[in-house]
Amino acid sequence: MNRNPDQNTFPNITLKIIETYLGRVPSVNEYHMLKLQARNIQKITVFNKDIFVSLVKKNKKRFFSDVDTSASEIKDRILSYFSKQTQTYNIGKLFTIIELQSVLVTTYTDILGVLTIKAPNVISSKISYNVTSMEELARDMLNSMNVAVIDKAKVMGRHNVSSLVKNVNKLMEEYLRRHNKSCICYGSYSLYLINPNIRYGDIDILQTNSRTFLIDLAFLIKFITGNNIILSKIPYLRNYMVIKDENDNHIIDSFNIRQDTMNVVPKIFIDNIYIVDPTFQLLNMIKMFSQIDRLEDLSKDPEKFNARMATMLEYVRYTHGIVFDGKRNNMPMKCIIDENNRIVTVTTKDYFSFKKCLVYLDENVLSSDILDLNADTSCDFESVTNSVYLIHDNIMYTYFSNTILLSDKGKVHEISARGLCAHILLYQMLTSGEYKQCLSDLLNSMMNRDKIPIYSHTERDKKPGRHGFINIEKDIIVF
C-alpha cells in the first residue's frame, strides 16, 4: 500500500526537505528511497537559480552568441529542469534527476561558470618552426606506407558532426587555459598551436574529471539550444565518453585519466595551454599506422596526414636535434609473430636493458599471464597507451590494441614492426627512460622505403561490455 507518511512517522527535517523538493508530501516508498539523498536534495533546494541563470546567459553570450535563443527561453529551460522532479513519480528517474542536478549545483560554477570572468594574461610561448623543410620528407615517409587497398563495397560508419562544434571549440580553448592542470589536448588542434596551417575539427582532450565536465557542458548546450543531449560511453574505448545531440551528431568527446597518469604524460606549454608533447604524438601516429583502418584513412586524405607529420618531424628535429640521414642501425627491431597464440616477440637488447618484449594481442591473456608471474609492478597508462606494461626478469610484457600487418605468411610488415617499436618507446617516455637514440633510428628507418603490399592482418582484440549512456531528457543513466 502506497500511503503518504505523516509527520509523526518520520523525522520532521528529512521529511520537510523531501517534501519541499518534490512539491508534494512523499509517499512511504519515496521517503524511504530518498531519505539518504536528503543532503544532496537540500543543496539543490537552496541552490541560487538566479545566479546560475546569469552564468549560463554569460556563457551563451561569450561562446554561443550566434545561437538564436532568448534570455527568457534560457531561464525557462533552467527553471523547468530544476522543477522536473515535481512531475516525476518513478523512483529511478528521481534518482537520475537528483544525481544530475547535484552535479550542476556543486560543479558548474567552478568548471564552466569560471570561464565568464576575466582570464589571466596569456603567456606567449610559441617557437617558430620551419615546417616547410619537413614536408617533402613527411610525404616520402607516408607514401611508402600508403599501401591499403580500399574495399569500395565496405560500408563505412558516418561520423556526423554537429554545427555546434565551432562554438564548443571556442569554449574549449578557454577551458584548456583555465583548467590546464586537469585538462590537456592532443591531435590536430594541438598541432595547430605549433603550425597555424593545420586544419582541425573538434578538439581532442584528456582530463581527470571528464564525466563531470561533459555533464555540465551537456546541460549548458541543452539550456541554450533546447535540444536533447545524450552522453555515450563506448565499451572498447577505455574511459571514453562522447556528447551527441538528439540527431546523433557528434559534438565533443573526452578520455578520462587518473591524476597520476596525467602527471607523467609528456607535455609542453603553449599560450597557457598544455598539449601532449608532439614527440609522444608522433610515436602514437607511427603506432596507429599498424591499424589497417588508419592506413585506409591515409589513402583517402594523404595531405592531411602530411601536414601533421611534417609538423611533428620539425618539432623533434628542433627539440631533440634529430638528424635525418637515413642511418637506421637496428630499426625497426626484429619482430616474430606467433599467430596461434597471438603474441609478437620484439628483440630489444640492442636498445634497452630488457632483452625482449612480449607483445600480446589479447588483453585478457596478458592479464592472466601477469597474474601467473606473481608480479605487482605493472604500469597502467590507461587510454594514453591503451595498455599496461610490465618488466619482469629482463622481459617486457605489454598489450597492443591495433592490428598487426603481415607482408607475407608469418612475417610482420615493417609498418607494424615500427608501430611496435613506437609502442615500447611510449613507455620509455612515460617513465623518463632513454629513448632519443632509438627515436632517431626509428624515424630514419622510415626514409627511402619502397611500398610493401599487405599480405594480411590480424584481427583486433574483441572488447566485451555494453554501451552506456546518459539521456537527460528521459532521465536515464545506464553505465
Swiss-Prot record:
Binding site for Ca(2+) 2: D202, D204, D253
Enzyme Commission code: 2.7.7.19
UniProt cross-references to CDD domains, sorted A to Z: polyA_pol_Pox
Domain of life: Viruses
Family matches, as InterPro entries: PolyA_pol_cat_Poxvir, PolyA_pol_cat_sf, PolyA_pol_nucTrfase_Poxvir, PolyA_pol_nucTrfase_sf_Poxvir, Poxvirus_polyA_pol_cat_C, Poxvirus_polyA_pol_cat_N, Poxvirus_polyA_pol_cat_N_sf
Induction: Expressed in the early phase of the viral replicative cycle.
Keywords of this entry: ATP-binding, Calcium, Early protein, Metal-binding, mRNA processing, Nucleotide-binding, Transcription, Transferase
Annotated positions binding Ca(2+) 1: D202, D204
GO MF term list: ATP binding; metal ion binding; poly(A) RNA polymerase activity
GO biological process, one term: mRNA processing
Active site (record annotation): D202, D204
Pfam families noted in UniProt: Pox_polyA_pol (PF03296), Pox_polyA_pol_C (PF12629), Pox_polyA_pol_N (PF12630)
Reactions performed catalytically: RNA(n) + ATP = RNA(n)-3'-adenine ribonucleotide + diphosphate
UniProt family annotation: Belongs to the poxviridae poly(A) polymerase catalytic subunit family.
Subunit structure: Heterodimer of a large (catalytic) subunit and a small (regulatory) subunit.
The protein's role, per its UniProt record: Polymerase that creates the 3'-poly(A) tail of mRNA's.
Protein name according to UniProt: Poly(A) polymerase catalytic subunit
Gene assigned in the entry: OPG063
